[in-house]
């Protein structure tokens, strides 16, 4: 044992122990040499749960999914060099979707920076504005002052990551060789006795009485709507429904709002606005005086377009993290306040005669017509097209299941075809940067928390993150993946690019002609190709009770999918015109 080894051990033990005391329970480690002491010390910790992922990009998204589902800070650790750069997509997503990640990158010591040393690059501020905070840690020392320094930075990292708005932080550790710490006796048997831990307390932002009364006055007796985008706070669901009923306002609920699948059916929850807000005649009849928006912007483009064209209204955005989530620049009142506090205080102060019944009836009538058409069309069709896949998932998913939703077409199909249901289905997606990368790994991370967990994903997105399946094989994780294989970029069929046939297939359609049964075999997954509705039902039913990785592939046609969507919209439009 050398003094260097003791210094290294004491310094890193103080830091890691404080991470755990502050609330970290899991660490995702990407193997490497320079990160050896941190990896060994984390593995040695008696409480910390370790996952090892050899692909850094997959590791980043696995940590993201785990942190998203658990709402706890999760640690990421990698060696020096380009390994850290591979975390960048997950870090960017964590920043935009406010997920607490603590990214630890090992680095060469200062004397080996910018001198051509192997596996060394500039890692200072590597993630730029995509992290809430960056620290280039001091070289290890074990004086009392430096042990307090290491401990302090452990607490601070968790605090910053968890403080509203939540997000990623980055700590860079320069480390000199030799890199192996002392593990016998365990470095964690005495650290708690040597140092007091930092206790972290969080508060909720509230509004002053005058602001509350002003908002109540502005909303009383007015025609208003709640718009609820992606927001993962189940404690808001029932209070929001209760307030909407008291006001007589509809709730335009994105699939990721939680309100379509929180275990109850409420007519104030509007789930088919994407269909009827396309119609100019209906839009003219649905002009609110007040909008209160919670969460990020919903996925629906017709809803976005409708909100953009509203004028001379009061438009509240409730944003406790001060992130200014207002891409359409419509806000008149930015409310930096805890959402639950606002709902409760408005409920308490709102008079009982505050609602306009006719206003709500208009919304619920249109929604009922559109929903009944969607449900009837899906019940009557025997063709296993993309909408039918979502409808079958809605019908077959067991109560309290989790559903991770891929970007591009899957989230939009869920918006259209996953109507409100009286089961509790936890829906998750990466809707910060909205990328198609890392979705498999994110779903696997979430599966650590939610069971049973299902993933609905497109073929290109699945291909993009097949490496993530190694975690399922290695740790025997339970996940059912439903691949909607339309052989390419199906969403582009709905976009203006589809009108340029000369280059459409080569640049946007991007057919791969991959057969995913071989990927399933490679990662020891049970594979099912569903060619009919009955086969899909059988595969989902089997997967619901099977422990392990299941891959269900459904091959669809991009052109038919577009035609089916358009036919559905026409049918809904005709029915709504007849209603008037």
UniProtKB/Swiss-Prot annotation:
It comes from Listeria monocytogenes serotype 4b (strain F2365). Homodimer. One of its GO terms (molecular function) is manganese ion binding. NCBIfam families: menD. Its cofactor is Mg(2+); Mn(2+); thiamine diphosphate. One of its GO terms (biological process) is menaquinone biosynthetic process. The gene is menD. Binds 1 thiamine pyrophosphate per subunit. Belongs to the TPP enzyme family. MenD subfamily. Its EC number is 2.2.1.9. Keywords: Magnesium, Manganese, Menaquinone biosynthesis, Metal-binding, Thiamine pyrophosphate, Transferase. It is an enzyme of class 2 (transferase). Catalyzes the thiamine diphosphate-dependent decarboxylation of 2-oxoglutarate and the subsequent addition of the resulting succinic semialdehyde-thiamine pyrophosphate anion to isochorismate to yield 2-succinyl-5-enolpyruvyl-6-hydroxy-3-cyclohexene-1-carboxylate (SEPHCHC). This is 2-succinyl-5-enolpyruvyl-6-hydroxy-3-cyclohexene-1-carboxylate synthase. Pathway: Quinol/quinone metabolism; 1,4-dihydroxy-2-naphthoate biosynthesis; 1,4-dihydroxy-2-naphthoate from chorismate: step 2/7; Quinol/quinone metabolism; menaquinone biosynthesis. SUPFAM superfamilies: DHS-like NAD/FAD-binding domain, Thiamin diphosphate-binding fold (THDP-binding). It catalyses: isochorismate + 2-oxoglutarate + H(+) = 5-enolpyruvoyl-6-hydroxy-2-succinyl-cyclohex-3-ene-1-carboxylate + CO2. Pfam families: TPP_enzyme_C, TPP_enzyme_M_2, TPP_enzyme_N.
């Amino acid at each position: 044992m050398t003094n260097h080894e003791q210094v290294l051990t004491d310094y890193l033990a103080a830091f890691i122990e404080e991470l755990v005391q502050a609330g970290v329970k899991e660490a995702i480690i990407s193997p490497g040499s320079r990160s050896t002491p941190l990896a060994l010390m984390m593995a040695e910790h008696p409480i910390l749960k370790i996952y090892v992922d050899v692909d850094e990009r997959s590791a980043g998204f696995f940590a993201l999914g785990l942190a998203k589902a658990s709402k706890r800070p999760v640690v990421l650790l990698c060696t020096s060099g380009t390994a850290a750069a591979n975390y960048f997509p997950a870090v960017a997503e964590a920043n935009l979707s406010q997920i607490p990640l603590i990214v630890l990158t090992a680095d060469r010591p200062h004397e080996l920076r910018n001198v051509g040393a192997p596996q060394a690059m500039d890692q200072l501020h590597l993630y730029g504005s995509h992290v809430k905070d960056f620290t280039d840690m001091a070289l290890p020392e074990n004086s009392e002052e430096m042990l307090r320094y290491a401990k302090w930075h452990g607490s601070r990292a968790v605090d910053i990551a968890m403080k509203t708005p939540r997000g990623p932080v980055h700590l860079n550790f320069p480390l000199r060789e030799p890199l192996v710490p002392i593990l016998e006796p365990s470095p964690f048997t005495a650290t708690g006795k040597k140092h007091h831990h930092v206790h972290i307390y969080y508060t909720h932002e509230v509004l002053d009485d005058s602001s509350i009364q002003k908002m109540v006055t502005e909303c009383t007796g007015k025609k208003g709507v709640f718009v609820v985008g992606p927001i993962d706070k189940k404690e808001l669901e029932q209070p929001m429904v209760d307030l909407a009923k008291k006001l007589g306002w509809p709730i335009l609920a994105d699939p990721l709002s939680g309100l379509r699948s929180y275990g109850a059916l409420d007519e104030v929850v509007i789930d088919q606005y994407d269909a009827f807000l396309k119609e100019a005649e209906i839009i003219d009849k649905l002009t609110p005086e007040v909008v209160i928006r919670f969460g990020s912007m919903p996925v629906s483009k017709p809803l976005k377009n409708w909100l953009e064209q509203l004028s001379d209204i009061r438009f509240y955005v409730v944003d406790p993290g001060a992130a200014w989530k207002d891409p359409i620049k419509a806000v008149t009142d930015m409310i930096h306040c805890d959402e639950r506090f606002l709902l409760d205080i408005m409920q308490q102060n709102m008079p009982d005669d505050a609602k306009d019944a006719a206003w709500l009836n208009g919304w619920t009538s249109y929604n009922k017509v559109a929903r009944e058409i969607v449900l009837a069309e899906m019940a009557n069709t025997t063709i296993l097209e993309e909408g039918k896949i979502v409808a079958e998932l809605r019908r077959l998913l067991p109560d309290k299941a989790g559903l991770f939703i891929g970007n591009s077409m899957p989230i939009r199909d869920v918006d259209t075809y996953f109507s409100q249901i009286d089961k509790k289905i936890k829906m998750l997606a990466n809707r910060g940067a909205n990328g198609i990368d890392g979705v498999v790994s994110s779903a696997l991370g979430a599966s650590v928390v939610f069971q049973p967990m299902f993933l609905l994903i497109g073929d290109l997105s699945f291909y993009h993150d097949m490496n993530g399946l190694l975690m399922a094989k290695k740790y025997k994780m339970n996940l059912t993946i439903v691949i909607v294989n339309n052989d390419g970029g199906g969403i582009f069929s709905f976009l203006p690019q589809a009108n340029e046939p000369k280059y459409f297939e080569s640049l946007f359609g991007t057919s791969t002609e991959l057969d995913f049964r071989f990927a399933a075999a490679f990662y020891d997954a049970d594979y099912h190709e569903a060619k009919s509705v009955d086969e899909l039902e059988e595969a989902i039913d089997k997967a619901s009770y099977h422990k392990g990785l299941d891959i269900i592939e459904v091959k669809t046609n991009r052109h038919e999918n577009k035609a089916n969507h358009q036919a559905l919209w026409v049918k809904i439009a005709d029915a709504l015109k007849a209603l008037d």
